[in-house]
């Protein structure tokens, strides 16, 4: 990963130079494409394809859990698994709500396989299904109070706080 602290000042030429070096910029951080996403792609595709062939459907985080727990990424680990929050979540099968996943690099890769006809879009559960799942989970777990660990803003921040008004106002609970 490469930091770009002055990313707002980049010219189109600067942006192109980063891209030519194989770096995908996400705000102030450049992610080396072949060191991250392409490394995962062959492994996650097999898991997507297996589910697709069986007519099974999962959420994006469930597919990631399957990949992590399968051990196919062990050769790439750069930290001890005991220090990985994602691996700990996978081991405990914690619910992770990933709204807007379709607008991510992995979402784009999944969409490319759908466009090529290799996978069905319905294999991946949608954002609406995340909301309905959260709406089902919330009343079952909120009696003693609940907490969320939020990563990111925008839709990631708005999504969990929208479920309560939806339950009260739209569902009239």
Predicted regions and their residues:
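Conserved catalytic alpha/beta core of Sir2/sirtuin-type deacylases, generalized to analogous enzyme cores
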Residues: 1-173
């Amino acid at each position: 990963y490469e930091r770009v602290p002055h990313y707002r000042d980049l010219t189109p030429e600067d942006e192109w130079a980063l891209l030519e070096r194989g770096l995908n910029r996400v705000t102030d951080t450049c992610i080396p494409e072949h060191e991250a996403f392409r490394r995962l792609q062959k492994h996650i595709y097999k898991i997507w394809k297996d589910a697709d062939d069986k007519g099974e459907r999962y959420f994006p985080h469930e597919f990631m859990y399957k990949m992590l727990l399968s051990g196919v990424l062990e050769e790439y680990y750069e930290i001890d698994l005991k220090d990985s929050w994602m691996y700990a979540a996978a081991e405990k099968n914690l619910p992770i709500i990933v709204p807007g996943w379709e607008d991510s690099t992995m979402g784009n890769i999944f969409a490319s396989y759908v466009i090529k006809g290799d996978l069905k879009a319905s294999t991946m559960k949608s954002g609406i299904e995340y909301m309905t799942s959260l709406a089902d989970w919330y009343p079952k777990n909120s009696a003693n109070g609940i907490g969320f660990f939020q990563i990111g803003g925008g839709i990631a921040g708005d999504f969990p706080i929208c479920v309560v008004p939806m339950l009260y106002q739209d569902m009239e609970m």
